[in-house]
């Protein structure tokens, strides 16, 4: 699978560090566990849907032994032309169940590089999931914070936090005069992986009507509870966006944070793939069908 996973050039440059075990995902995981046991740090790129075949080996040979194996989940999320059997919408859900696994998803190529470097140094089993294809061409992230275990990245702060003291005083006066009618709505948008770029687009479009905070979760496990709680306490209004199933992914994790910390009066709306097998179609077509496109999410926020 060196072509499908984009490793042909690596194989040419480092032939002695490259092993193609064929279509044998179970063997690939167990072999990697053995290599890790002997002091190496193996990196394994396998398609999301193919990890299902090696789930037993991930649990018993890697996670239970707490070995430093870096499992790269290629074709995560909707895969488009690869077809229904290759849709990668289940991996966050089934990996989140497994003890000892750290689960990450980068927002762009640079963050993927940073996560790989972080994973090599972590000395624990790691999942890094990423989609088929390239980056979102409309959004370019100029700032990249260092990767810290279980730490999210706040990409967009509230507009009113950037205002001068004079502006804030004038707004408070206006609030009193107009019976708080000048108070803007607030929303926290939490996204992971490729959907972070979409969250930023949505945040930019919504900022004329409301104050928006966009959080790049980075880690599904461990989730950055503190950053999420801090934001939710300010907004009481949460949107989650992910390219995985609605069950046991980011939406579930954020709802657990809200319930476990007894956060009252919080509205939450989640955008993810439904609890069904995703049909064949292009990524754009399927995102529109399942309500993950930008226009549908913006309309949903405006109606909430």
Task: Provide a role label for each language-model segment.
Residues 1-124, 134, ...:
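Thiamine diphosphate
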């Amino acid at each position: 699978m060196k072509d499908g996973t984009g490793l042909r050039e690596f194989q040419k440059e480092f032939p002695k560090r490259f092993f193609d075990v064929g279509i044998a995902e179970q063997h690939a995981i167990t072999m990697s566990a053995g290599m890790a046991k002997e002091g190496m740090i193996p990196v394994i790129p396998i398609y999301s849907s193919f990890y299902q075949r090696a789930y037993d080996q991930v649990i018993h040979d890697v996670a239970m032994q707490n070995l430093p194996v870096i499992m790269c989940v290629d074709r995560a999320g909707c895969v488009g032309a690869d077809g229904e059997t290759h849709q990668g919408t289940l991996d966050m859900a089934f990996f989140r169940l497994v003890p000892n696994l750290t689960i990450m998803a980068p927002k762009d190529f640079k963050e993927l590089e940073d996560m790989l470097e972080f994973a090599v140094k972590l000395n624990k089993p790691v999942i890094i999931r990423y989609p088929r294809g390239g980056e979102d061409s409309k959004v370019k992230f100029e700032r990249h914070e260092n990767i810290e275990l279980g730490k999210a990245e706040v990409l967009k702060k509230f507009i009113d936090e950037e205002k001068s003291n004079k502006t804030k005083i004038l707004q408070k006066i206006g609030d009193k005069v107009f019976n708080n009618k000048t108070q803007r709505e607030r929303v926290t948008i939490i996204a992971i992986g490729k959907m972070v770029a979409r969250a930023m687009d949505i945040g930019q479009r919504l900022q004329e009507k409301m104050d928006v905070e966009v959080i790049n979760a980075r880690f599904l496990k461990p989730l950055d509870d503190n950053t999420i709680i801090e934001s939710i306490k300010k907004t009481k209004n949460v949107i989650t966006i992910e390219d995985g199933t609605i069950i046991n992914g980011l939406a579930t994790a954020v709802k657990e944070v809200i319930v476990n910390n007894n956060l009252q009066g919080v509205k939450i709306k989640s955008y993810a793939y439904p609890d069904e097998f995703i049909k064949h179609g292009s990524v754009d077509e399927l995102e529109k069908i399942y309500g993950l496109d930008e226009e549908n999410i913006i309309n949903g926020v405006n109606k909430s």
